[in-house]
Amino acid sequence: RSSAASDVYKRQFEEMSGIFDARQVDVSALEEDPDGVSDASVDGRNFAVSGGVAKSVENVIREKYPDREIKMANAEGLKECRKLLTMAKAGKYNGYLLEGMACPGGCVAGAGTMQSIKKSQAAVNKYAAQAKHKISSQTEYVKELDKLVD
């Protein structure tokens, strides 16, 4: 929607494709890392649950800057997201990290979900708890990010 375009930052598959093309990354030529998923963090695995992305960002900031104040607000469901954006535009959330998930409960409860939101969230939480690392900045893959920066 053009009315929200300047207020909402998102990344779509088409845009990611453009980024990969610009960086000359051939995704189809990449080899699958069988340990890749097992090296994920609790935070990374919780991205699919409402509040999970913002919590991951918060945890990395707290690790690096423990005294920094972090204000966050999140919404789930389009109605609540719209309300959050309206309040943000009115200045109610200046300096806040905002997270909005279109689906109630987060992506884990998206259109293809075949079980209750609570059951889906519980399954994600159980899977996340088995991760080797708590915070995403503790995984081996963070070191690879420097290669993407000139």
What is the role of each PLM region?
Residues 7, 13-150:
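Long, compositionally biased charged/polar accessory segments in the mid-to-C-terminal portions
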Residues 1-5, 9:
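Single conserved hydrophobic/aromatic residue that forms the stacking wall/gate
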